Swiss-Prot record:
Binding site for Mn(2+): 156, 158, 227
EC nos: 1.1.1.267
Catalytic EC class: oxidoreductase
Name of the gene: dxr
Molecular function terms, GO-annotated: 1-deoxy-D-xylulose-5-phosphate reductoisomerase activity; manganese ion binding; NADPH binding
Chain's role: Catalyzes the NADPH-dependent rearrangement and reduction of 1-deoxy-D-xylulose-5-phosphate (DXP) to 2-C-methyl-D-erythritol 4-phosphate (MEP).
UniProt family annotation: Belongs to the DXR family.
Reactions catalysed, as given in the entry: 2-C-methyl-D-erythritol 4-phosphate + NADP(+) = 1-deoxy-D-xylulose 5-phosphate + NADPH + H(+)
Organism annotation: Rhizobium meliloti (strain 1021)
SUPFAM superfamilies for this protein: 1-deoxy-D-xylulose-5-phosphate reductoisomerase, C-terminal domain, Glyceraldehyde-3-phosphate dehydrogenase-like, C-terminal domain, NAD(P)-binding Rossmann-fold domains
Name the record gives this protein: 1-deoxy-D-xylulose 5-phosphate reductoisomerase
Co-factor requirement: Mg(2+); Mn(2+)
Gene3D superfamilies, alphabetized: 1.10.1740.10, NAD(P)-binding Rossmann-like Domain
Length: 391
């Protein structure tokens, strides 16, 4: 566990050039920058100019690009700065294992699994923005956090909301949790209209500012599907205790229902910096200059049930939870492959869920993972099966 909540925090950011990573650095600078945080390492992928600029600005000790072919470019960009440079999978592991009490795990996709697991095993407090650690690895990741002795602080706005309102001494009285979903840009579109949308249209989220892949996952509601599986592991819930409601305003971030009929919710303007600030300052709250809710101007809050015909990702998540085994890894691997194909224009929007369902059908009954090798094997089989369908 990180030492001393009042001391300067030593932090590594895995995925600093993505949407969550850049927002994390913005929060750090608003909370005092180098006066309150020491940055042990930053990692990125292909945006070398941004990674180098971030490392210089925040005074990082180590900068890592996941792309081994870009090592020389990053080294040149940081020449004379005194900042160490590394690349590839070994570089990501080096960043994760570097002495830092806190780690922001914001690498998108399965690429974030290995380094985040390495950080958890050494006992770092993990601010978790990577969904795949829980969707694919599930209890293996939770066990690694417990064995390492660190804390797990969710950064997804929905899970962060639940974490904030969940009364730890009353967990036995939790009846259900309700994850809210904006409905994305296609909430009111017909199936026929959705059949012809492009990636550029799908990425335009009505409320949140996010990266390309996460925005499209939100449009298909696969983002919410992954969050359902995450919530099961994070809060040790049964599948039937997890509900989803569409809430177009994205003001209520999630709710916890108790056995006495009470429902507690966390509200706020849609800004990821709120959840990031809460995680980085935990157990205290920080002072952030984000927009405040104006209830008079807001006037109303709307809720509606998700349409699982137009958005079948929800039922696929429920199926993955009920079947157990490595179906979370199968769902995610197939989804990532289908998503990449959609972005490249090789398949239509609705084909993503169709491919995932067929892959889950074909790989049903795989045993539960007993090691990360089992997780990676299931993921690879799902990706291969999806790729065969796309070819």
């Amino acid at each position: 566990m990180a030492s001393g909540d009042d001391l300067k925090r030593r932090l590594t950011i895995l995925g600093s050039t993505g949407s969550i990573g850049t927002s994390t650095l913005d929060v750090i600078e608003r909370l005092g920058g180098r006066d309150r945080f020491e940055i042990a390492a930053l990692t990125g992928n292909g945006n070398i100019p941004l990674l180098a600029e971030q490392a210089r600005r925040i005074g990082a000790e180590l900068a890592v690009t996941a792309d081994e072919d870009r090592y020389g470019e990053l080294k040149d960009a940081l020449s004379g700065s005194g900042i160490e440079v590394a690349a590839g999978r070994s570089g990501l592991t080096e960043a994760a294992e570097r002495d830092a009490g806190w780690v922001m795990a914001a690498i998108v996709g399965n690429a974030g699994l290995g380094p985040t697991l390495a950080a958890a095993r050494r006992g770092a407090d993990i601010a978790l923005a990577n969904k795949e650690c829980l969707v694919s690895a599930g209890s293996l990741f939770i066990d690694a956090v417990a064995e390492g002795g660190g804390r797990l602080l969710p950064v997804d706005s929905e899970h962060n909301a639940i974490f904030q309102v969940l009364e730890n001494d009353q967990r036995h009285a939790v009846e259900r949790i309700v994850l809210t979903a904006s409905g994305g840009p296609f909430r009111t579109k017909t199936l026929d209209e959705m059949r012809h949308v492009t990636a550029d249209v799908a990425r335009a989220h009505p409320n949140w500012s996010m990266g390309l892949k996460i925005s499209i996952d939100s449009a298909s509601m696969f983002n919410k599907a992954l969050e359902m599986i995450e919530a099961r592991h994070l809060f040790r819930l049964r599948p039937e205790q997890i509900e989803v409601i569409v809430h177009p305003q994205s003001v209520v971030h999630s709710m916890v229902g108790y056995t006495d009929g009470s429902v507690l919710a966390q509200l706020g303007c849609p800004d990821m910096r709120t959840a990031i600030g809460y995680a980085l300052s935990y157990p205290k709250r920080c002072d952030l200059p984000v927009e405040r809710l104006d209830f008079a101007r807001l006037a109303r809050l709307d809720f509606e049930a998700p349409d699982e015909v137009r958005f079948p990702a929800i039922k696929l998540a429920r199926r993955a939870m009920e079947e157990g085994g490595v179906q979370g890894a199968v769902l995610n691997g197939a989804k990532e492959t289908a998503l990449d194909a959609f972005i490249k224009g090789r398949i239509g929007f609705l084909a993503m869920a169709e491919i995932v369902e067929k892959v889950m059908d074909g790989l049903a009954g795989l045993p539960a993972a007993t090691s990360m090798d089992d997780v990676f094997a299931a993921d690879e089989r799902a990706r291969r099966a999806a790729a065969e369908m796309i070819r």
